[in-house]
Amino acid sequence: MAAVGARWGRRVGYRRRRPLPALVVLVALVVLSGLLWTRVFGSVEDIDAATTCNPPGAPTAPPEVSGQPAQVPLGTMLERDALNSTTPVPPQDVHVRVLNGNGESRQATMVGDELASLGFSKGGADNDSVYVNYDLQCHGQIRFGAAGMSAARTLSLIAPCAQLVRDEREDAAVDFALGADFDDIKTTQEAKQVLQQLQNWVPQRDHQEGAQQEVTPPQISEDLLTKARDVHC
């Protein structure tokens, strides 16, 4: 019995766990997290760089020689998210003039036709009176005044790589200047959904205006608006 008591009374030594595997996992998680955040910030910086345009150069020849319109001031270049808090309007309320800022023949006309097929109001095509040397080195610019912020917001949903530029115009018309990097209208499925929802809202707006009621703005998901502009530029 004494032997049995001695066996059960023996203190079992504490087995110390080696911390190395847990430490390796922790380090790996920290490194992975750092890589993910680097990619996030890198992608933001990349798209900011891709959507930033050069300032216009001075005219190389006077208008009477070049055949170009007299150069006008550019306006203020804005951040890509400058209109994120602005409510878009239906595309048929957006009067868009497409400008040739890159020297590509007939491109502005074809883009204007494509915008019309998406429901935008045609404002014609013309040569750019800001980048008169056709030296717009980016995807393009959306130019607007204070009255055209909502219209510019709508256009930016299907031209998410274009830089936003605010100028001193007084009407709600918007200019879409095409740059050297422009390849096509980038209409995501989410952007098409937003345009359709805006068009579906028009009868409600017209009814409220006809009844002299306060117009309820369109209810568009913020997540949908964000995804509409989530493209590679």
Residues covered by each model-derived region:
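Residue-level signal for protein termini and structural transition zones
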Residues: 1-233
